[in-house]
């Protein structure tokens, strides 16, 4: 199982956000929809975790087996 850092305060009302990985530090995170910077290193070099499904909710992440780390 992989850890996902979830930036709760940045998500929309239904806890939906963009699931991205930073190409510089490797961090996997759920950030605000349309976010452009890594929450760890502030790099703007982000890539979708899944090109076919950029937006996820916290329950969807849990159902997929991810470990949620709230930030």
What is each residue range found by the language model?
Residues 11, 27-28:
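Short, flexible, glycine/charge-rich loop motifs used to bind or transfer phosphoryl groups or to couple energy/partner
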Residues 22-25, 38-41:
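Short cysteine-rich clusters marking metal-coordination/redox-active sites
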Residues 17-19, 35-38:
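Residues immediately within or flanking Cys/His clusters that coordinate Zn2+
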Residues 1-18, 47-71:
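Short, intrinsically disordered terminal segments enriched in charged and Pro/Gly residues
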Residues 29, 45:
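Cys/His-rich microdomains that often coordinate metals
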